[in-house]
């Protein structure tokens, strides 16, 4: 089997392709590397100006080495092998959008540190309990959530009460699974 691509190698390729220096760039795309990236290694720490980092469609198992990314606002990690949210604390004060669909996340432990997170795309993961889902209510800025394809959503959508139950537990949501959330008190006026 081919050796995994390191972040350092992927950054060197990206620099060659774009002519930009990774340490100065605001947006860096390292998605779908061949062979895939397996580790978020220490080379990420040089991305001091990066505001949007895409590492989607690789084979990353752990979120790590984000401490140097002081300006990171958007992190794209969809289609990897991530099992938990450990490692996000390093960007807890800046991250506004986390795209982490198509992974293997079952628990939302550690999400509460995301003080500025507005958008969370985490469809097609393994969250199956309300006890995990309610942790999203601890995010003061969360407005837009995509949660379709998690066992919890599938179960309640089949029972036709997903949106009602989810918005009851995370009342600040403005958009759920791509649909604007209509607040109950507005409906009562009809």
Curated annotation (Swiss-Prot):
Keyword Repeat among UniProt keywords:
yes
Q: Which InterPro entries match?
A: Leu-rich_rpt, Leu-rich_rpt_4, LRR_dom_sf
Q: Which UniProt keywords apply?
A: Acetylation, Cell projection, Ciliopathy, Cytoplasm, Cytoskeleton, Disease variant, Dynein, Kartagener syndrome, Leucine-rich repeat, Microtubule, Motor protein, Phosphoprotein, Primary ciliary dyskinesia, Repeat
Residue spans of the LRR repeats: 49-70, 71-92, 94-115, 116-137
**What cellular component GO annotations does this protein have?**
cytoplasm; microtubule; outer dynein arm
Q: In which tissues is it expressed?
A: Expressed in tissues carrying motile cilia such as respiratory epithelia, ependyma and testis.
- One of this protein's GO BP terms? outer dynein arm assembly
Query: For the LRRCT domain, which residue ranges apply?
Result: 150-190
PROSITE patterns attached to this UniProt entry: LRR
Q: Positions modified as N-acetylalanine?
A: 2
Keyword Repeat set for record: yes
Q: Which GO terms describe its molecular function?
A: alpha-tubulin binding; dynein heavy chain binding
**What does the subunit comment say?**
Interacts with ZMYND10 (via C-terminus). Interacts with DNAH5, a outer arm dynein heavy chain. Interacts with tubulin located within the A-tubule of the outer doublets in a ATP-independent manner.
Q: Name the disease.
A: Ciliary dyskinesia, primary, 16: A disorder characterized by abnormalities of motile cilia. Respiratory infections leading to chronic inflammation and bronchiectasis are recurrent, due to defects in the respiratory cilia; reduced fertility is often observed in male patients due to abnormalities of sperm tails. Half of the patients exhibit randomization of left-right body asymmetry and situs inversus, due to dysfunction of monocilia at the embryonic node. Primary ciliary dyskinesia associated with situs inversus is referred to as Kartagener syndrome.
What further note is attached to this protein's record?
Outer (ODAs) and inner (IDAs) dynein arms contain the molecular motors that generate the force to move cilia by ATP-dependent reactions. There are two mechanosensory systems that monitor and respond to the mechanical state (curvature) of the axoneme. One system involves the central pair microtubule complex and radial spokes and the second system involves the outer dynein arms.
Question: What job does the chain carry out?
Answer: Part of the multisubunit axonemal ATPase complexes that generate the force for cilia motility and govern beat frequency. Component of the outer arm dynein (ODA). May be involved in a mechanosensory feedback mechanism controlling ODA activity based on external conformational cues by tethering the outer arm dynein heavy chain (DNAH5) to the microtubule within the axoneme. Important for ciliary function in the airways and for the function of the cilia that produce the nodal flow essential for the determination of the left-right asymmetry.
Q: What is this protein called?
A: Dynein axonemal light chain 1
Which species is listed as the source?
Answer: Homo sapiens (Human)
């Amino acid at each position: 089997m081919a050796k995994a691509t390191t972040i350092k190698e992927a950054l060197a390729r990206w620099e060659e392709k774009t002519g930009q220096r990774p340490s100065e760039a605001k947006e860096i795309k390292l998605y779908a590397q061949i062979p895939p990236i397996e580790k978020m290694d220490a080379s990420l720490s040089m991305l001091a100006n990066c505001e949007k980092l895409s590492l989607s469609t690789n084979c990353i198992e752990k979120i790590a080495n984000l401490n140097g990314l002081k300006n990171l606002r958007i992190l794209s990690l969809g289609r990897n092998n991530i099992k938990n949210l450990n490692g996000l604390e390093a960007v807890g004060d800046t991250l506004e959008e986390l795209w982490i669909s198509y992974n293997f996340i079952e628990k939302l432990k550690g999400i509460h540190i995301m003080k500025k997170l507005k958008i969370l795309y985490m469809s097609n993961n393994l969250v199956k309990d309300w006890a995990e889902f309610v942790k999203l209510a601890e995010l003061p800025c969360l407005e837009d959530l995509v949660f379709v394809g998690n066992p919890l959503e599938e179960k309640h959508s089949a029972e036709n009460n997903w949106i009602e139950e989810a918005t009851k537990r995370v009342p600040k949501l403005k958009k759920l699974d791509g649909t604007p959330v209509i607040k109950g008190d507005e409906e009562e006026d009809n």
